[in-house]
């Protein structure tokens, strides 16, 4: 791992779709990815449950549990070089660890939100936009999926 000793999350939320509307809540321990997956599995909803986590204004993680299936997405695979939580994420997702000379690219399941209306090309374009910080990328995802108002309320509370 690199020299990043302290990892701060800008925010970490879980969202689930039930009875035609989204509900969201803050995640208490965003570095404990196994616990997050267990929490998402407890949300037995028709649209599954999603965790969105931003780390140090550098990258974001997305985890989606739908039934027994778990999908993973990271906005920049090279962050696993410096961030232990990203390296653990890649291990859970069964993705190869990056090399020092790898390009900063998204990795994982680009179709993680396709059935909810956010297609892989749009997600990839969001991640490629150098003008957007990870929290802004997550806000765009929330807007596209339909829970931007709930996210704004949660972040302002």
Give, region by region, the residue ranges found by the protein language model:
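Short amphipathic alpha-helical segments, especially helix-boundary/capping motifs
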Residues: 11-14, 36, 114-115
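Charged, compositionally biased boundary regions
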Residues: 82-157
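Generic structural hydrophobic/aromatic packing signal, biased to beta-strands
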Residues: 12-14, 52, 89
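Non-catalytic, solvent-exposed interaction/assembly segments
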Residues: 6-19
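Compact, well-ordered interaction domains used in eukaryotic information-processing assemblies
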Residues: 2-4, 21-85
